[in-house]
Every structure is written in C-alpha cells, then in structure tokens.
C-alpha cells in the first residue's frame, strides 16, 4: 500500500501483519474526529458540511494547501490549523487515509462475529444463533447476574426472559434494584448489544477452556464432544491472541506521525467484548466518493447511504434517551440502530437487505467492497492499471529478427514522451518542456531522430490476454514503423497463442534500470525458446515456414542434373543458381564436416549402378569413407543456415524434425545461435513456400478406388451381425457394439488407403499430402473426411459433466469431396455445432481451474539448495505405457537428481551416482540399458524443507536445462504449466466436426514385438465347440482374472511387454512359443464379462425366479426369449431377500461350484442343462464408453482429481491382504469378508446389484478393488499411505493430458500441486501439546508442536519439590533432573515424572480449493474465496501473516519473495570495489542461513 509522504502511517520495512479485532480505544486512536451529522455536501456551495460525512475538519482539505474558509492558501502555511474553520492546511490526498468515527448511543454487536458459521459469540456464550438473534434484536432479556431473586425463582445466568417475566421479577423485588451493580446479590438482566457486551466482559476464558477440555476427555456422548470441540477452538483462539495490556511507547507505534499519537493509545490482544462496538470507524471520504454528474446531480457510493442511516438513527436515539422516551420506543430505535450497523458492515447476509430507491438493488456494504472479483483484494490490489502502456491490433512482421517487434511511431512517441522531451531539452533543441511538447505535437522530423535514439536498447514488454503462462508476456526491442498496428515475429505466435485475425496486444514500458535489465536478460523473446511445462521448444516454425522447408528438402526422381558429382557446397549453389540443377535433384557432394546421425536413404546410387559400374564402385567407397555425401540440392541450401556444431542435416525437414533440431541446438549451442538459426530458417521457409507455389485444388483430394469394395464388405458384416441378433445369439447391446466396431474398422482402413494414395500421387508432391506430411496444416483425420469417409458421428448429449454421447450406428459413407446427402449433412451439423458451443463454455472452466491451481501453489518457492532428505521416489520402467505411446521412462527421470546410485543390475556398473543430476544423455543411456528396471530419484513429494522446497528435490529448470536456482517460483510455473493446456482439454469436443473417434473394441490382442511367451497366474480349461460351418473347434479358455502373458527376450530373459488377459479370453499361444510381431496372442469379448463353467455337471438355478429375480423379454424382431436378471427388491417384502446364483451339481446332486449372477446379466443356460468346462452360462454387459477414454473425460476428470472428490460410485477396496469369502445377504446389501493368515478379518457391505470382481477363495492384496467402480483417492491414502496416493494422482492426471489432448506436462509440475494437497494433517490425540483434537494444521506446525514437548516431562508426583512445581504440570527434563539431584543430596523425596505425550495425527488429502483456503497466509486466503469468513477467523485468532507467499506481498505492495526479491539478496551490499566471487557466494550462503533462521524464529 502506498501512502503519501505527508503522514506515512505504514513504514515500508514491516515483515509481517497481525490481524485482530479493533478495540474501542484503537478505533478512537485512528479517528480524527467524530462525525455528528448525516449531511455530505451543501446543496448550494457544493462544499462539505461541517461535522458531516465529508467534513474537511475531520478528513482534511478538498483542495491542496487550502483550508475550508480560504483564510490560508499556498504551501507556505503547511501544517497550520486554521483558527476559523479548524481545517489543517495540507494536501488533499490525506482524505484517502484519515478516518473518523461515530460514537454510538448504545453498544452494537458486530454482525461478522455473530452471523459467521459457527457463530463466534455463540460459541463463547454457548448460545445458538437463533437465541442470540432474539437477544441482540431486543426481543428477550438475558440474565447477566441472577442475584438473590434469581436464586429464589430458580433462574440461572444466561436464561432468557420475556418482558412479562422480567417486569414481574423487578416489581416483586423492588428493593433489589437499589443495590450497587457490582453487588453479587443484585438481579441484572439486559437485552441487545449492551447485554452481550456485559456477558462477554465477564467471561472467564481460562475456566471455560479447562471445562471444555474436561468434557472432551471424559464425555461419552459424541455430540457433546463435537460441540465442546467447536467451542474450545474459539475459546483457545481468544486465549492465544490476548496479550496483557501494555502501553506502547510513542516512538514504536509507527502508525501515526510522531506528534500525533493519541495519549490513551494502547496495544493489546483480543478481548471477547471487542466483538461489541461502542464506536464505529468511518472510512476516509475518498474511498466512498461523491462524484458530480452533468445536470447538477451527484453519484454517490452506497457506503454514504449506509453511514447516513446509522448517523440518523444514532442521533435520533440520543435525543430519545435525553428526553427519556418510553422503553418501547427506545427499544425499537435501538433495534433499528443495530440493523443499520449490520447493513453497513454486511448487507448481503441479511434476508431483508437495504435496497436503493430507484433500481431496487441491495446497497454495497463494507464486506461487499472486499469480496469477489470486483472487491478490493482482486480488483485493486492484485490487478492494477498501469501507465506507460498502450494497445493495438497485431500484424505479422516476417522481416523482423526474433528479438524485435514493430512499434507504430504514433504509439512510441506517446509512450516515450517524457524521455523524448528530456532529450530535446538536454540537446538544446527545445528551450522548455512546453516548447518540446509543441514540437512533438507538430510531429517535427527532428522528433523522430530523437525517438530513435531514445528507444535504442530500451526493451518494451508485449502481452496478449489471456496470459495463461509466463510466455504470454515477453520483451522485445522495438523498431519504429509507419501505420497503426504492432508487428510481431511469426515464431513467437505459438507462445502468445496469437493469430492475425484481429487479435490485439498491449505494450508496456519498463521504466527503472532494474526493470530494463530484467526485461533484457530474462524476458527477451530470444531467451524464451523452451516451454517451461515440458522442456520442449516453443518457437517452432509452423504453416508456410514448415511447408517451405519440407518442399525444399524433399527429393524428386528425374530432376535436372540428377546424380551429378560436386566438389563443394558452393559449386552446388552456383550450378543451381545458373539453372543447371533442379532443387529436388539427388547429387553427390564432397564433404568432410560433421554429419547428423539420422538420415534418409536416397536412391541415386542405384541409378548410377544402372548406368555403369566404375563410377558406382568409386562413389560407394567415398560414401563409406564419409568424404562424399549423397544428398539433394535443397538440403545443401538448407544446411547453409545450420550451425557447424550440429553437423549436416540430411533429412526431409518436417515440423517434428525442426522441433527436435531446435531442442538440440538450444541445449548444445545456446540461445544466441539458436535464435540466429530460427531467423534464417524463417526466411528460407517463407521463400521456398513462395517458390513452390503450393496451393490446394479439388483434384488434389483423391478418393481411393477400393473404397466401394470396403464399404460393401462392411455392409456384409453388419448384415451378418443383424442375422446373429435375429437368431438370438446376440443381445441388442452386443449387436450395437459389433456394428459400431465394423464401421470404425472400415473407416480406418479407407482412411489409411486414401492416405497411401495421396502419398504415391506425383511422387509425394501432391500439395495436400505435403501440407499434411510436413505438419504444416491439417491432420490425417481431416484427410479421412476429405477423401475417405466421414465415418461414425457421436450423438451430442445435453450433459455438462463431460460425458460423451453414444455413437450413431449408421455412418456417413460419403466424404466431403463427393458431397453429403441431406440426411448425412443434417447428422454432421449436429455434432459440429456441439463442438463450437462446447469450446466457448469450457474456456471459463479452464480459467477457473488455473486460478485455483495458482492459489494453492503460489507460495511454493525454491528456498534452499538441499534439504538433506534420504527419501526418494521410485520410478519404474512400465512396459505397457511405453508401448502405448505414453511418457517414456527416460522422460520421467530426465532432469532429476538421483536419490541413490542408479546402476546396471546385469553388469553392476554405476551409471549415475547418488546426488548427481540425470542429464539428457544419461537418461538416454539408462533407457537403453536393460539392466535398469527402476530408478530412485529426488522428488518434490519427498522434500523435507519446512518452507518452500529445495532445488535438488525439484531437479532442473526445464526452460534452461540447469538445476533450478534458489528463488524460482516453481509453484506458479507448475500452475501455469497445468492450466495453460487445460484449455485444450475440451469436454471432448468431438474432434473434426463432431466425428466420433476412438473406441474400437479390439477382439484380438497382437504381439507388439517378437519373443518367447511366458504365462503368469493363468488358469485355463479346454473347450470343444462346433462353429457355423459345422466344424469342431478346440479353444483354450482363461478362467482366472488378471492373468498375464509376458513376452520375454530369449537372450536376456527381460520382459519386453506384459499383457493382462481378461477372464474368458481364448488363448492362441502356449507357454514357450516363439511369437512374431503382430501375431495374435488371445481374443476376448470386449463388450461383456462372461460367467464360464469350470467343471462338468448340471446347472441348477438358485433364487432365479421368473418375474421376481429375472424377466423374460421376447425380441419383437427375432421372436427369441432373452432372460435378464433384474433388481428384485421392489418385488418382495422388507424381510425377504434373494441372491441369484448359478450352481453346478454333480451326478449325486452335490453342489460343486457356485457363481453369483449380478443384476443386468443375460442367462445363456436353462435350469437342469448339462455343461462342460468352457461353456458360457451368462454374460454381464459392460458399460463401454465408445468415445474414448474414461466416462468423465478431459477437464472435468482433471478437476475431479485435483479436487480429490470421491467418485459417484466408488469401488469398495480391501484394507488388508487375504482371501475372499461371501457372508450373509441382507435385503439391500451382501457381505464380503477378507481374512488373512493371522486371523484378522474385515467385513464389507456391498449394495445389491453392484458387480463383485472377486470370487470366493480369491487372494487379494490391500488396496485392490473388490467391486467395480473408480477407486477413491481417499481410500488409497487411508490404506496405502500418502506416497501411493501421490503417485496415483500424478499418474491419473498425466493420463488425461496424454491420452485426451496429447499434451506433454512434466511430472514435477503435477508433483508440486499434489504436494500442496497433502500439506495438512488432522490431529488425532493432542497428547501434552497445545493442539486440539481434530485440528487441521500444516505438517510443519505439527512437527514443531511435537518438538516443543519432546524435551518436557509431566509431573506425576511432586515429592518435596518447590511450590512452583505442581502435579500434572509440564516442565523441562533438564530442570527436573537438576532439582532431583538437589533433592537427592538433601535426602528428600524425589519428583516422579513421565515423558510428555506427543500428539498423533493422520495425513489429510485436500482438494485444491480447500487447500488454498487453508493456507497459512490470511491475506492470500482472503483474496481467494470466502473473504469475510477468513478475515473473521483471523481476527479472532489474532493471526499473523508472515508474508511468505507471492500474493500477499503483491497486495501489500512489496517485492515478491522470489527471484531477486529473496531475503538473501537484500542482505548483500556491494561496496566500492567488486566483491570476489567466493566472498559473494559466502555472503549469499550466510544470508540464506540467516533467512532460514529468521523464518524458523517467526
């Protein structure tokens, strides 16, 4: 907060801010005078009324250096108080900071403390809000002291009395009223604020605390203990915040100018009676202004109206008291005053809020001025308007360098005007500022020369809203241009997410030397080439540039001058420029420089062989010796721009290759060279895109001839499926799923063929194919729609939860080139519109997610180099993930610090010693070493630094490939990295124009690579069946869940890939088989789970009764009956129960095997039917989500994980390892028991109808789900502990980003957020600490509390100790040992003691919203959500904000404690001479240690 220099109320060097309830003395001490009249300004003179709400005497003059009556004008009278009007001569800015007050006729209760939940006053007095309300609003009397009459009448303290009861006692005991108020015998009962004030004043907090703790320990009633705990929290808060009154020396208060401290200015802690006010502060008039409008009317702040109501009612009440009005009238007036004050403080909480006359909206009270987006916190303190800024439309500037931007002259002269004026005056071109301004207005030519010199070397900042990550603001060197639009470099568009369809950008001028330095060194666009979220380049050429480079480096057989031999690159360029050599010709060039490892194979050598052998042999030898290079003319031209260090790039350059090159360059040769390379390839790309003249015509989209054949086949297949359905062998659900699969496959085949057709057209020079293959524009999906078939369309749903609609089973067979039929067009519009409307709706959700992430992580800053932890995170090589295209093992370990030695288990060689950073090269080695199965790395999740995190646990800063520096705001970077791509996570906007993608449910699983088959936990049966053609087929059917097939490398025995085999799968391989790539391993039914007979016998139905537990549905089309198990609860009486199951009995009638049948199962056997192993007895349909991924996809899923919400239908999870058995069945649930070898048993109740995954006798591990449904993160935390839940959350969120959006986010960003979600613990037993049971506190606070009692003991018997030592007290062990030594010497009885008990707790997983609200910083939490609640709680507890995070420092106007704003940098002072580097390092280390000590002290 910046105050004027006149009376600086807040010194700039404060380090913390304390919140407490203002005492009546402090309200008066801050006030400059009492506001007595409700008037604001005089209607004729428009000057403030004296003693009114705008009074100059109280708040200061309305004009600089001029008093109200005009006696004193000019600055020379500064500080004089006018003897006529009493106004001090000073600047008008004091009207922004001087406060007044209103002295109330009766005490009034502060609405925040009475209406907050739980009510603070209610908790202290043990009264409900309803009862409090009746007392405060003058409906009932409350007994303050029962006295003698109370004892006789059986009335206790705090009893409520009606008016009749009260007057009855008063009249009955008239004499009693003559006693002194302090006499304990006097009966006292009051109402309103006065009563509450007296009750709070007489409270014994210490007594209450003892009593409540006793209830907590001894009470058996859960409700009583919960109430006591709620009250104890408030009592303890007051006890801790109250400090004995102490007078503060005048000097030390820093709140007022020296000569102006009111004498009774006393600083003290909170007393409960302060929640009742005797005077109300009046905020400075400039903060509630009166603004004149045209037509003589005034616009006023709502606060003035609210204050006016209070003053009018207060003055009227004073008058009524003076004239001794009847009690009824007084009571009504007092109630109205209480209501007026309530409305002033918080108008939105009341049901009958005070409204304005004309528009009938509720008036904005003081609370509303703080709350929400338009409140003081978010509007003026976190987001401020800035000067020296401008905005304009952007256009592309292809000729700019990467670090430049084009700034229109008219904008530049406005922005840099003060500097230009100074330069003009200095050089004597203008005599004064005024004349300089005139020159500028006339646009004199000399002005432009001066402007050029002024802006030289002065960067400007460009920003495009929304600023989703730090690359949304970058610095550029401006170059002056004509016109009115800002020009920006095409390569920075990706970072800004800018395009040139009318986007606007803002320009800001960094003014101070430090700001300019930071802009040039840290923010210049040529230094920001890498994305902090993934470590991948962001300045990647796109569109025309990529197309140009691709066209340039492609080869075309039969080009002019093909297979020529050249002795230098220069010769090649000359021949090409002379027109003797085609751009795409394959040629041989003598070259002895470095070569890039990867290259394309070119065929020119084969052509030479066809021509003759001598030349061929010589060339072959030269190529082998690497003195000759087979390449193309275009690639020689391209390599002119490539730095020598990288070598000669002999590949077709598409977007992927360009990205990889830029990444390599930035890490190998640094940013300067990379920026130069980027500028060069930009030029080359644009030039050859123009030369190639590439454009798309209708004839470029080629439809494959085989399309009709494939469509016929698909129609045949779908007819076959319908026939099977008609025969009754398929359910309707299976028919639908199989038809969708048929079309999905066909669509993919046609798409692939159309792609291949394009590829072959014109030797790969089809413009459409080139745009697609280079990555310049378009995707395979779009080509499929243009030249293949549009395929299946998803039917949009209304739901906003992110659930996709199902797929329409009739596909769109036409493609866009052929044109759609009317019906097909109608179907596709539906999906396309849904996509567009989703896009606009989801943006707000993504923005809100980003905001919550920022709030939860904003105070995570790197504060130390090494926390010294011994724990790490195990990262395992996951074969399934690697082959399914998820993040590779090397990506997960790259840039981390090894917690333990990483070594090759086969050779025993150490690859990375503990404490070393795993670089890109080392990660590559580890990835290729089969002997490394896992690596233990340092992680943010296991970091043990108390404040912030340490740089070794974080690892490298992804954008600079170096270990992160102390002071880096990694929390904010993490929030930006997750929030920015969040916008791309649509509510699965059905991709291109609503076509459905994804979910082909594969029936066959094929080998990903070759190797030897190995079975793991697989149980099978053999089954012979006769197929449609009447031939007998043998099948091996899996009858165990979660069996695995491993493909093993024959030489090393290493598992290359692991496949989970579902129950009921048909195996196509046996253990020990050698398989080839793409060989079928097993086939399975993807749309249902099967119940399969495992033995020979006869089926017997149990509890399967027609009309009760199953229904018979006859399909109208096929005439076949289908038996489906139904929910039977509604069919039976409350006491009855059923458990449908299939039993297999042997010849003697003994039950051999029982299978429970869940609701919705379809039966495939009759009662009494004979079965053999492998027969399908029933199928349980699976709820397949056909539009890819999980049911809730994309953004809603990410939000669900970050908020740690319990899923809607969570799985029941076992808490112990053991064996499953089924217990009794109740009406609505059945028992599942898990028993382990030690006899421990857990019982779980499962809702009837929920599908149970475990069978009788199955072995299960702790944390394994027993039923279907999503596993709740809270369960994982409870059963498997914090590490497991952290890993689970990181992996699940990563999956959504990877699979749904293909976005790469480094794990460490997610870890930072997840760490914040697990920062709190809940106290179970407080032991001998000062904590309360059920308290939710920071882990560091908990450890500190335990540390405090670790050296203390509890006295069990005091013996002959001195009187200060009493039983049951806590004392230091050292002190007691010393006393016992003395007692032993004197042969007296020793003190008996036992160690103090430490508190116990369990970790709590909070969602990001709760975690942000639970932050230690009051200011940060208040600016996030629930402002009034946060401030009320903070004031009661007397909380101190240590200003540790970023947000709170921005709000109080200090430098943020990150980067150069860290404490350790402030400690360093540079002398006249340069400090030696080692000295500077030592000073920094010392400063850091000092900062840590201070942090610990605080």
From Swiss-Prot:
SUPFAM superfamilies, per the entry: beta and beta-prime subunits of DNA dependent RNA-polymerase
EC number in record: 2.7.7.6
Domain of life, source organism: Bacteria
Binding site for Zn(2+) 1: 67, 69, 82, 85
Comment on bound cofactor: Binds 1 Mg(2+) ion per subunit. Binds 2 Zn(2+) ions per subunit.
EC class name: transferase
Residues annotated to bind Zn(2+) 2: 867, 943, 950, 953
Residue numbers binding Mg(2+): 499, 501, 503
Gene Ontology terms, MF aspect: DNA binding; DNA-directed RNA polymerase activity; magnesium ion binding; zinc ion binding
Keywords per UniProt: DNA-directed RNA polymerase, Magnesium, Metal-binding, Nucleotidyltransferase, Transcription, Transferase, Zinc
SMART domains: RPOLA_N
One Pfam family from the record: RNA_pol_Rpb1_5
Entry GO CC: DNA-directed RNA polymerase complex
GO biological process: DNA-templated transcription
Cofactor(s) named in the record: Mg(2+); Zn(2+)
Catalysed reactions, as listed in the record: RNA(n) + a ribonucleoside 5'-triphosphate = RNA(n+1) + diphosphate
PANTHER family xref list: DNA-DIRECTED RNA POLYMERASE, DNA-DIRECTED RNA POLYMERASE SUBUNIT BETA
Function statement: DNA-dependent RNA polymerase catalyzes the transcription of DNA into RNA using the four ribonucleoside triphosphates as substrates.
Family statement drawn from the similarity comment of this UniProt entry: Belongs to the RNA polymerase beta' chain family.
Quaternary structure and partners: The RNAP catalytic core consists of 2 alpha, 1 beta, 1 beta' and 1 omega subunit. When a sigma factor is associated with the core the holoenzyme is formed, which can initiate transcription.
Annotated protein name in UniProt: DNA-directed RNA polymerase subunit beta'
């Amino acid at each position: 907060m910046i105050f004027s220099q006149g009376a600086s109320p807040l010194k700039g060097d404060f380090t913390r801010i304390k919140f407490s309830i203002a005492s009546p003395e402090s309200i008066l001490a801050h006030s400059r005078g009492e506001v007595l009249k409700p008037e604001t300004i005089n209607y004729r003179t428009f000057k403030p009324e004296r003693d009114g709400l705008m009074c100059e005497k109280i708040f200061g003059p309305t004009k600089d250096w001029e008093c109200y009556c005009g006696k004193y004008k000019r600055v020379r009278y500064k500080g004089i108080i006018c003897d006529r009007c009493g106004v001090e001569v000073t600047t008008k800015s004091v009207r922004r900071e001087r406060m007044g007050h209103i002295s109330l006729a009766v005490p009034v209760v502060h609405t925040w403390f009475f209406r907050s939940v739980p009510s603070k006053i209610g908790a202290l007095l043990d009264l409900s809000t309803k009862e409090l309300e009746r007392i405060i609003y003058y409906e009932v009397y409350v007994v303050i002291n029962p006295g003698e009459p109370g004892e006789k009448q059986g009335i206790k303290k705090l009893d409520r009395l009606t008016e009749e009861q009260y007057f009855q006692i008063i009249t009955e005991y008239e004499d009693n009223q003559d006693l002194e108020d302090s006499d304990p015998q006097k009966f006292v009962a009051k109402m309103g604020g006065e009563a509450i004030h007296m009750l709070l004043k007489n409270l014994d907090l210490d007594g209450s605390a003892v009593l409540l703790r006793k209830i907590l320990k001894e009470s058996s009633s859960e409700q009583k203990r919960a109430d006591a705990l709620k009250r104890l929290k408030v009592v303890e808060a007051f006890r801790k915040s109250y400090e004995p009154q102490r007078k503060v020396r005048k000097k030390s208060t820093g709140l007022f100018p020296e000569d102006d401290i009111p004498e009774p200015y006393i600083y003290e802690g909170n007393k409960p009676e302060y929640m009742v006010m005797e005077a109300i502060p009046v905020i400075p008039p400039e903060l509630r202004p009166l603004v004149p409008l045209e037509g003589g009317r005034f616009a006023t702040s709502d606060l003035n109206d609210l204050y006016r109501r209070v003053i009018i009612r207060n003055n009227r009440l004073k008058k009524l008291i003076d004239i001794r009005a009847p009690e009824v009238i007084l009571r009504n007036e007092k109630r109205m005053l209480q209501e007026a004050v309530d409305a002033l403080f918080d108008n939105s909480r009341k049901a009958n809020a005070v409204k304005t006359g004309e528009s009938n909206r509720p008036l904005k009270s003081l609370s509303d001025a703080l709350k929400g987006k338009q409140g003081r916190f978010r509007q003026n303190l976190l987001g401020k308007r800035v000067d020296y800024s401008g905005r304009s439309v952007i256009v592309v500037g292809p000729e700019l360098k990467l670090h430049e931007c084009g700034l229109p002259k008219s904008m530049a002269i406005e922005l840099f005007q003060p500097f230009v004026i100074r330069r003009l005056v200095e050089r004597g071109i203008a005599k004064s500022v005024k004349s300089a301004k005139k020159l500028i207005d006339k646009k004199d030519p000399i002005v432009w020369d001066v402007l050029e010199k002024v802006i030289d070397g002065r960067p400007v900042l460009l920003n495009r809203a929304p600023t989703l990550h730090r690359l949304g603001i970058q610095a550029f060197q401006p170059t002056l241009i004509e016109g009115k639009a800002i020009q920006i470099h095409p390569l920075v568009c990706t970072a800004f997410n800018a395009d040139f369809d009318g986007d606007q950008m803002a320009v800001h001028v960094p003014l101070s030397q430090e700001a300019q330095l930071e802009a040039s060194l840290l923010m210049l666009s040529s230094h920001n080439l890498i994305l902090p979220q993934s470590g991948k380049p962001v300045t990647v050429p796109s569109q025309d540039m990529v197309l140009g480079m691709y066209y340039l480096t492609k080869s075309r057989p039969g080009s002019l001058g093909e297979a020529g031999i050249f002795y230098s690159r220069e010769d090649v360029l000359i021949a090409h420029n002379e027109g003797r050599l085609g751009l795409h010709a394959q040629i041989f060039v003598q070259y002895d420089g470095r070569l890039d490892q990867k290259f394309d194979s070119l065929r020119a050598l084969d052509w030479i062989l066809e021509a003759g052998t001598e030349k061929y042999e010589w060339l072959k030898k030269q190529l082998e010796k690497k003195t000759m290079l087979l390449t193309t003319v275009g690639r020689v031209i391209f390599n002119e721009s490539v730095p020598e260090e990288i070598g000669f790039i002999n590949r077709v350059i598409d977007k992927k290759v360009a990205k990889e090159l830029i990444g390599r360059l930035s890490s190998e040769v640094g940013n300067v060279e990379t920026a130069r390379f980027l500028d060069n390839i930009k030029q080359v790309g644009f030039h050859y895109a123009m030369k190639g003249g590439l454009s798309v015509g209708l004839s470029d989209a080629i439809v494959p001839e085989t399309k009709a054949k494939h469509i016929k086949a698909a129609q045949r297949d779908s007819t076959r499926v319908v026939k099977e359905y008609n025969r009754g062998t398929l359910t309707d659900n299976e028919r639908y799923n199989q038809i969708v699969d048929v079309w999905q496959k066909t669509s993919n085949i046609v798409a692939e063929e159309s792609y291949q057709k394009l590829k072959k057209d014109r030797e790969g020079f089809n413009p459409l194919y080139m745009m697609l293959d280079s990555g310049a524009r378009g995707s395979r999906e779009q080509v499929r729609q243009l030249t293949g078939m549009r395929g299946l369309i998803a039917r949009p749903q209304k739901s906003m939860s992110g659930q996709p609609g199902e797929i329409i089973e009739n596909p769109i067979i036409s493609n866009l080139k052929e044109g759609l039929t009317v019906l097909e067009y109608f179907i596709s519009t539906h999906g396309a519109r849904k996509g567009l409307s989703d896009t606009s709706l989801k943006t707000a959700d993504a923005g809100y997610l980003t905001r919550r992430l920022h709030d939860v992580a904003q105070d995570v800053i790197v504060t130390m180099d090494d926390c010294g932890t011994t724990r790490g995170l195990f990262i395992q090589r996951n074969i399934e993930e690697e082959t399914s295209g998820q993040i590779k093992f090397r990506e997960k370990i790259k840039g981390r610090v090894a917690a333990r030695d990483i070594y090759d288990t086969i050779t025993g060689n150490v690859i990375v010693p503990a404490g070393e950073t795993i670089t890109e090269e080392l990660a590559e080695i580890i990835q290729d070493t089969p002997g490394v199965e896992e690596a233990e790395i340092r992680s943010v999740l296991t970091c043990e630094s108390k404040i912030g995190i340490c740089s070794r646990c974080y690892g490298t800063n992804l954008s600079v490939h170096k270990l992160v520096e102390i002071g880096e705001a990694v929390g904010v970077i993490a929030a930006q990295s997750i929030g920015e791509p969040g916008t791309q996570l649509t509510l699965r906007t059905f991709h291109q124009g609503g076509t459905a993608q994804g979910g082909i449910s594969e029936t066959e699983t094929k080998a990903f690579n070759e190797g030897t088959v190995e079975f793991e936990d697989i149980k099978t049966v053999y089954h012979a069946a006769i197929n449609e053609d009447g031939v007998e087929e043998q099948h091996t059917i899996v009858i165990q869940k979660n069996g695995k097939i491993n493909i093993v490398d024959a030489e090393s025995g290493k598992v290359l890939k692991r496949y989970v085999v579902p129950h009921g799968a048909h195996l196509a391989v046996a253990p020990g088989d050698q398989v080839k790539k793409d060989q079928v391993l097993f086939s399975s039914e993807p749309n249902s789970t099967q119940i399969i007979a495992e033995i020979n016998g006869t089926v017997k139905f149990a509890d399967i009764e027609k009309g009760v537990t199953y229904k018979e549905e006859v399909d109208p089309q096929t005439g076949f009956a289908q038996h489906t198990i139904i929910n039977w609860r509604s069919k039976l009486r409350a006491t009855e129960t059923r458990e449908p199951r299939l039993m297999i009995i042997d010849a003697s009638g003994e039950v051999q095997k029982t299978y429970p049948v869940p609701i919705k199962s379809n039966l495939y056997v009759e009662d009494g039917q004979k079965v053999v192993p492998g027969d399908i007895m029933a199928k349980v349909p699976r709820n397949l989500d056909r539009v890819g991924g999980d049911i809730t996809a994309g953004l809603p899923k990410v939000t669900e994980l970050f908020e740690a919400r319990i899923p809607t239908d969570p799985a029941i999870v076992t808490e112990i390892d053991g064996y499953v058995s089924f217990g009794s069945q109740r009406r609505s649930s059945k028992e599942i028991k898990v028993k382990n070898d030690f006899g421990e048993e857990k019982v779980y109740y499962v809702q009837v109808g929920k599908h149970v995954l475990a069978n009788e006798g199955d072995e299960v591990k702790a944390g394994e789900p027993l039923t279907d449904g999503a596993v709740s993160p809270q369960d994982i935390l409870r059963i498997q502990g914090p590490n497991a839940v952290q890993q689970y959350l990181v992996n699940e969120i990563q999956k959504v980003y990877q699979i749904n959006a293909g976005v790469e986010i480094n794990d460490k960003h997610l870890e930072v957020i997840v760490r914040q979600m697990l920062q709190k613990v809940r106290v179970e037993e407080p032991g001998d600490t000062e904590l309360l049971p059920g308290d939710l506190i920071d882990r560091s606070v908990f450890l500190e509390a335990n540390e405090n009692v670790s050296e203390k003991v509890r006295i069990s018997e005091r013996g002959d100790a001195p009187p200060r030592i009493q039983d049951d007290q806590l004392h230091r062990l050292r002190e007691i040992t010393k006393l016992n030594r003395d007692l032993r010497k004197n042969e007296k009885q020793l003190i008996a003691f036992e160690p103090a008990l430490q508190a116990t707790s369990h970790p709590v997983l909070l969602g990001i919203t709760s975690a942000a609200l639970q932050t230690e910083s009051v200011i940060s939490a208040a600016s996030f959500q629930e402002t009034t609640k946060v401030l009320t709680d903070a004031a009661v507890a007397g909380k101190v904000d240590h200003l540790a995070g970023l947000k709170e420092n921005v709000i109080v106007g200090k430098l943020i404690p990150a980067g150069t704003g860290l404490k350790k940098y402030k400690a360093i002072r540079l002398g006249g001479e340069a400090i030696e580097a080692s000295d500077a390092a030592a000073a920094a280390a010392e400063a850091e240690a000092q900062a840590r000590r201070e942090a610990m002290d605080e």
